[in-house]
Amino acid sequence: MARAIMFQGTGSDVGKSVLVAGLCRVARNRGLKVRPFKPQNMSNNAAVSDDGGEIGRAQWLQALACGVPSSVHMNPVLLKPQTDMGSQLIVQGQVRGEARGRYYQELKPQLMAAVMESFAKVGDGADLVLVEGAGSPAEINLRAGDIANMGFATHADVPVVLVGDIDRGGVIASLVGTHTILPQEDRAMVRGFLINKFRGDISLFDDGLAAITRFTGWRSFGVVPWLKAVSRLPAEDSVVLERAVRGDKKALIVAVPMLPRIANFDDLDPLKAEPAVEVVMVPPGSSLPADAGLVVLPGTKSTIADLLALRENGWDRELVAHVKRGGHVLGICGGFQMLGRRISDPAGIEGNVRDIEGLGLLDIETMTEPEKVVRNVEAVSLLHDEPLEGYEIHIGRTSGPDMARPFARIGDHDDGAVSPDGRIMGTYLHGIFSADRFRHHFLRALGVEGGQMNYRESVEEALGELAEGLEASLDIDGLFALA
C-alpha cells in the first residue's frame, strides 16, 4: 500500500479540496509520484474522468495538479443530490441507483470494499497518496459504517491532519471541540492540524496555535494565508456562489439564476475570468438584472424540479422580458432542456412529475431515458466554426425543429439547438468556455472583446502560485514525513 496522508476538516468548505490540490502540486514539484483520493464525495459538480466515468470535479482538478490522468478510482463513491431526501449513487464512476437517508447508512459498510479496492489501485506505483475527507469527522451520529472520514482512516491506517478555517471564525473552538468529541480510536489517528484562510499578520495567531496544542496535544503544521490564487481555481461547493456579490459594472453582464440543484457551475469560471465580463449569480427571491446581455441557464441535477423553482421565482417571465429587450440566452444541459416546449419523464426518473411544459424559447422537446450519457468529447462550434473540448453528463433525448440549427457537431452527430434569430442557444456540452478561441468569438458576437487569455494556462499558473504559498507557510517536510 502506498504512503498516504488524509486531510479532514472541522466542517464543510474549510478549503480541503484546494489544499489537497495545492499539496499535490507541491509533491509533484518535489519529484514525487503523487495521486489524489477521496473515498466519498457529495457534489453535483461532476467531471468525466479520463477513463470514462463520473468523479467529483475537485478530484479532476487534483489529478491535474498531480500531472496524471483522472480516474474513477480517485473518487470511488460520488453522491449527487437530486431531491431533499435522496441522491444519485455513483460507484467507481457508474450509476448504482438512488441513496436515501437511512438506507444509505445501511449500505455504507458494503461500499467500503469498493473504496479500498480503488484506494489500492490509486496507490499502485505512487510514492504518495493525498486523501481528502468529507464534511467533518465530528459528526459522530454518522460514524457507524463511515467511509468518508475516520471510518476510512482507521480501516486503511492512514494518519490524519485536521484543517480549520479561521476566516469563518471560531477556529479554536472548532478544532478543540473536534478533539473533545472524537472517540479515542479516532483521536489517535490525528497527527496534527493546520489553519487555513488567515488574513493579516500571522504572528498575531501564535498564542492561538499554542492554545490549540495545549488543549489537544496536536502539533501545528502551520497557517495558510488568504491566497489570491485560490479564486482563480474551480470551486466545488455551491456555497461559494451564495457569497458572490456584484462588482464594478462591466461591458457584458451575464446573469445566472441560482437553481436549487445547480450542477457543473464551473462552466462559468472562464467567463468570470474575463476582464470585460461580470457574472451575476441571482439568488432565489431576486430579479434577473435588467442590464444583462446574456442569461445562462446552467446545468442541474433535477431539471423538472428546478424548472418549477425557476417559475416560482418569476424568472420565466423575466426571461421572456429579457428576450423581448433583445437579450441572449444560453442553456447548458438541463438548462437547454428547460428552454424547450416540453419535458417528459414517463418512467419517473426525476420524481413524480411525469410531464411539464417548458419555457418555450426553443422549438424542441425532451424525453428522459434511463441510460445516462457520460463522456468527454471533441466538437466543433457551428456558430463560429471553432473547435471545442467538453464533456456530457445527462439523461434525456432532445428533438424538434430547432435542432435543424445545431449548436455544435460531435463526430458524426449534432448537438444542441439555436433559435431562428440566433439569440436563444442550447447545448448538452459542459466546459465549452474553456476553449479560448470559441469564447473569444462567442463574446465578440455579444459585442465584447474577450478570449485573449489562455484559460487552461491560467489554471496551471494558479496551481503553481498555490503550491508556492503552501511551501512558504506550511511545514511540508513534517507533513510528508507523516506518511
Swiss-Prot record:
Active site residues according to the UniProt entry: 333 (nucleophile), 430
Span of the signal peptide: none
GO biological process: cobalamin biosynthetic process
Keyword tags: Cobalamin biosynthesis, Glutamine amidotransferase
Keyword NAD set for record: no
Domain GATase cobBQ-type per the UniProt entry, residue ranges: 251-438
Pathway it works in: Cofactor biosynthesis; adenosylcobalamin biosynthesis
GO molecular function terms noted in the UniProt entry: ABC-type vitamin B12 transporter activity; catalytic activity
CDD domains: CobQ_N, GATase1_CobQ
Pfam family, one: CbiA
Gene3D superfamilies: 3.40.50.880, P-loop containing nucleotide triphosphate hydrolases
Keyword Membrane in record: no
InterPro entries documented for this protein: Class_I_gatase-like, CobQ/CobB/MinD/ParA_Nub-bd_dom, CobQ_GATase1, CobQ_N, CobQ_synth, GATase_3, P-loop_NTPase
Function: Catalyzes amidations at positions B, D, E, and G on adenosylcobyrinic A,C-diamide. NH(2) groups are provided by glutamine, and one molecule of ATP is hydrogenolyzed for each amidation.
PANTHER family: COBYRIC ACID SYNTHASE, DETHIOBIOTIN SYNTHETASE
Family classification: Belongs to the CobB/CobQ family. CobQ subfamily.
Name listed for the protein in its UniProt record: Cobyric acid synthase
Protein source organism: Brucella abortus (strain 2308)
Annotated gene: cobQ
